[in-house]
Amino acid sequence: LNELMDLLAWTQQRNIHLILDESFVDFSEKSVENTLLKNEVLETYPHLTVIKSISKSYGVPGLRLGIAASSDKEIISYLRKNMAIWNINSFAEFYLQIYSKYNNDYQNACKKFIAERQRFFEVLQQVDFLRVIPSQANYFLCEVTSRFSSTKLVSLLLEHNLLLKDCSTKTGFDGRNY
């Protein structure tokens, strides 16, 4: 969090607008402390916009529900002006009506997930051809270091009904086996 606050101060001094995606912050070990989705932070740093996809946090891909928060009135005005008139579907509206009823269950599930993530990380590290990158999200990025290409490993595991994403063709990975 300290590094993020340093980056935020740096961007503020240079009049740079920072957009921070907190879609996976609920899975971090100290999610309440890690979030910048707080009025005092947003008011202190008007060049900050925090976005969060609810569908990623709650694992509901069709939900199409998210948050954008900023104290920059121009940004908020722009978003409101350019937002579709019907920007929420009935499923998302229903979710908002029942959200608070299940919030404690969700928080408990996140705590269990955090404990399980650590155990899973330790198991993955035992695979001799994987370099596992530590994560605070609900997934791990792994580099396949030998034995298979990432494409081949994804294909082999799919035969056992294990779904992985081959990131070797993604921008920034330069064809490496992730």
List PLM regions with ranges.
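Active-site pre-lysine segment of PLP-dependent enzymes
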Residues: 1-18, 22-57
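Conserved PLP-binding catalytic core of the aspartate aminotransferase-like
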Residues: 113-114, 127-160, 176
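PLP-dependent enzyme catalytic core of the Aspartate aminotransferase-like
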Residues: 2, 9, 159-160, 171-178
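PLP-dependent aminotransferase class I/II
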Residues: 47-133
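Short beta-strand->loop
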Residues: 54, 163-168
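Residue-level detector of structured alpha->beta connecting loops
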Residues: 15, 46, 128-129, 161
